[in-house]
């Protein structure tokens, strides 16, 4: 049964497919479908992973707002395979992936799907897209991710007008995105690094100088979706 409100629950998944039929490399379509309305947001990436998930979700949020819940499978991008630490066991919490941690900071509930059948709406979407969208990309002669993303951005509004449905309730439960640059600080990879006595840290096998002298044993390094580091 569908949720009644737009923004209440969004299904997310990645479809690995030969989207360009040999005109370019195989890639992944990261797709979001609203459970109440079947409205679709989608974007192509070269792989399904944390940075593509964060980048696509950030773009979704900037267009529609922050949903209440996200439904995803047990891919390690979404669900951490790690065993709980002693501290987590004592606190009654579970390990989180970087993406799961970001959703928690945004107040989004991450719901795990235990089978493809549980993600019926997004699975049916991919069946449709692997037919309809592949044909559209073929007609346009598209063979790169960059060109495909420009095409999909222009094509999806007409697709949604045709196939989205009216939700049972009119209220949209999406919330505004965080003000300022907070979204960039949340949807990023956060890693704790040991702060040396000379105020340097080692990250990705590189030595970095911390400009502001702080009294701490560790600092948090942020790898952002745009490739910058803070």
Describe every region a protein language model picked out.
Residues 1-18, 86-94, 172-183:
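Basic, flexible linker segments flanking DNA-binding modules
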Residues 70-74, 78, 85-132, 148:
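RNase H-like two-metal-ion nuclease catalytic core shared by retroviral integrases
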Residues 30-31, 42, 219, 229:
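Generic short beta-strand
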Residues 24, 74, 204-205:
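Residue-level detection of beta-strand-connecting loop/turn positions
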Residues 153-230:
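C-terminal, beta-rich DNA-binding module of retroviral/retroelements integrases
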């Amino acid at each position: 049964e569908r949720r009644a409100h737009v923004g209440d629950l969004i299904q997310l998944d990645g479809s690995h497919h030969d989207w360009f039929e040999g005109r370019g490399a195989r890639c992944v379509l990261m797709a979001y479908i609203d459970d109440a309305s079947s409205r679709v947001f989608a974007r192509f990436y070269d792989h399904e992973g944390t940075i593509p998930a964060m980048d696509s979700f950030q773009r979704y949020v900037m267009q529609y707002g922050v949903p209440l819940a996200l439904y995803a499978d047990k891919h390690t991008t979404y669900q951490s395979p790690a065993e709980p630490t002693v501290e987590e066991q004592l606190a009654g919490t579970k390990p989180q992936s970087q993406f799961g941690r970001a959703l928690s900071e945004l107040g989004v509930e991450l719901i795990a799907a235990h089978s493809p059948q549980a993600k019926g709406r997004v699975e049916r979407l991919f069946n449709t897209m692997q037919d309809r969208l592949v044909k559209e990309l073929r007609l346009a002669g598209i063979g790169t991710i960059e060109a495909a993303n420009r095409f999909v951005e222009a094509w999806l509004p007409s697709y949604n007008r045709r196939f989205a449905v009216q939700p049972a309730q009119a209220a949209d439960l999406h919330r505004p995105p965080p003000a300022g640059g907070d979204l960039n600080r949340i949807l990023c990879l956060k890693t704790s690094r040991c702060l040396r006595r000379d105020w340097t840290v080692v990250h990705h096998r590189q030595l970095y100088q911390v400009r502001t002298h702080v009294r701490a044993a560790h600092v948090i390094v942020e790898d952002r979706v745009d490739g910058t580091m803070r």
